[in-house]
Amino acid sequence: VAAKKRPLSSMTPTLVLKDGKPTLVTGSPGGARIITTVLQTVVNTIDFGMNPAEAASTPRIHHQWLPDELRVEKGLSPDTLAILQKQGYKVSVKPTMGRTQTIQLRDDGLYGYSDPRNPDGQTLGY
């Protein structure tokens, strides 16, 4: 932090629309892993048809410039880890990464999920 400097921020509050109407609202607190956490939640929901609980519960993957390592969350399959290492990635397994709060809006109601990685979190909608 210094005068005339902008703080680094990865804030990514996300609203996904379909035909102009909201279908998914999600976000994540934290730092550098916000963008990949939110992206993986959106991809899991839209592309893989997961509900918010399933989308949040899958193991996460993150890479940034420094440190030059691929961080993966515990629970990623050993086969996948072996493939990544064979491709030359320096893989670092972490117990947890990122947290989300997500609400999915469907025709039959609202489905919210508070990521269990944050035991104090709540997902609220009205």
Q: Where do the protein language model's features map onto the residues?
A:
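Proteins synthesized as precursors that undergo proteolytic processing into mature forms
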Residues: V1-K94
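Cofactor-centric catalytic regions
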Residues: G75-Y126
